[in-house]
Amino acid sequence: MQFPALPAIPHPLQFKSVTFTALKPGPKLIVLGAVHGNEVSGSKAILKMIAEFEEGARLLQKGQVTFVPITNPLAYNRKQRNGDRNLNRNLTPTDNPVDFEDHVANWLCPLLAAHEVLLDIHSFQKGDVPFALFGPKNNKSKLESFTHEEAERGLALRLGVTRFVDGWLDTYAKGVANRVELLKKTGGSGEGLNTDPRYGMGTTECMRSSGGYAVTLECGQHEDPQGPGVAYRAIENTLIHLGLVEGAAVEAVTDYQHLSLVEVNDKQHFEDQFVRPWSSFDLVRKGELIGIRHNGDEVRASRDGFIVFPNTLSQAGQEWFYIAESNTQP
């Protein structure tokens, strides 16, 4: 499968989206790529899909689809994860933008709110098998109330992957509580963006807070040549599943792995080190040595589970790795 070349962006301080609207009403879908600037598999797939619509190979039957190939152009131009900070944290509009990602939020959040369904395409630093993340079960909690559980999980099961993860925001909030406690013990104020549970707000959380539903696709390791194809099939399946384009019905996968995030561990010092090069979904046993703090303290697994999103490049006070457990519930 051939994909268009990634574009140069001579002026990264502006934003671009491409929207197709059918004559008949229907669902409003938005597809994001390069929320993190070095994750471009989704961008390649989105550009291919845009070209197919523009060339007449595809026709929107109903509703609307908006494509954003490069959501964070500054980070993309720098070929790095962030521009000034992580766009997928504290994603909320502000009257007083301080960094570039604040400006992105002021553009992106209203755009998300104008749609009903989000597919956000990412890739990961360490690991091999693509997977998708979906949100909570229906609930009325203050942190992340939600009413579209069936639709969201139904979409996730049709993206073409067989591994699924949930529990993100709830686990992040628990991690924030631990972060605040540590700061107070060490003389910190316990105040600031990364000590607010809402700091965990990213694109999918923003979409859910606007009344829609959202799925994140992690389409493979950053440099995996199969990544754009995984992303392309997910976009196509989503368009068909929502009835936006014609195509044979996409069946939900029935044989899959479902994991729930249950714990997050921060890097406390820039010299904290893993004891080996962990990859997402490596199995860990209770008591197994995972890393060593700069002061020599050992970091061991608190339970049997799987390590997720191990980040050797994380900064002190930010997430170092997550632990997930198998979930037998659909």
Q: What spans do the regions from the language model cover?
A:
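Structured catalytic-domain cores with a bias toward divalent-metal coordination
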Residues: 1-330
